[in-house]
């Protein structure tokens, strides 16, 4: 396993330049191969004062690759296994230990699935390469895509595809899966892809349907949206005053969650209309660093196509 197997980090220059302001603890909650962390550490070297980079990933392969990539930085980085929804319990001990009382000044989340995971058939993330129906970001996780495809009832599958895939053919696909598995369990990504393609009334739309169904399964397997909501709450709580929170999202479901959370933190609560209060019931807790989400440039998209749908939002805690 080598860090070169991992994708070029998306919006790296923009996210790092907007995130890093003052020395302190910086958290890369989606370490992957260490691309963003490398840029963060290089930027932190230009600041006067002690800093510590904490990298979090639930994939042991990613931790191994990032460890090689960031080896030159020694004890200025700490890499820990876990998902970013556990950020509070993972980072708080470091604030008292290796962090030596440093404040948390930045938290970065890149919510995309790594190209290494997608391109590794054994991980079961892609319909383009046949492999076991797995999709676990944590290889030791309890739930696989095969468990869902072969175990959920038709109504539950349809609901899942509508909710997490926003797939209009969700009910039709669910029926096709239940029919197919009645003969034998679906165990590979290729078998599932064949069932989905056959169920699509228009073959020119099959790729979009495949993408949405696989997205829905991946989100369910890894509880991605629940983990994100937990990480937003706990990550913001960890930040010191002046600390910044940057999130790169790739699809509307996760971006809506981030947008709603950031809007709540940057808005004051003035209570019901008509109260005419002199001061808000609850003041804003943060300010927007960028008013509109940043997107990749045409140059970056041509160089790194997976950046096409990326959106970067950043707030600063008051």
From Swiss-Prot:
Enzyme Commission designation:
2.1.1.199
According to its UniProt entry, the function of this protein is described as:
Specifically methylates the N4 position of cytidine in position 1402 (C1402) of 16S rRNA.
Cystine bridges: which residues?
A: none
> Could you tell me where this protein is found in the cell?
Cytoplasm
Q: What is this protein called?
A: Ribosomal RNA small subunit methyltransferase H
Biological source species:
Chlorobaculum tepidum (strain ATCC 49652 / DSM 12025 / NBRC 103806 / TLS) (Chlorobium tepidum)
Q: Name one GO cellular component term.
A: cytoplasm
Against PANTHER family, the record matches this protein to: 12S RRNA N4-METHYLCYTIDINE METHYLTRANSFERASE, S-ADENOSYL-METHYLTRANSFERASE MRAW
What Gene3D superfamilies would the database entry show? Putative methyltransferase TM0872, insert domain, Vaccinia Virus protein VP39
The gene is rsmH
> Which EC class heads this enzyme's classification?
transferase
Similarity comment: family membership = Belongs to the methyltransferase superfamily. RsmH family.
* Residues reported in the UniProt entry to bind S-adenosyl-L-methionine: 34-36, 57, 84, 110, 117
Which interval of the chain is the signal sequence?
none
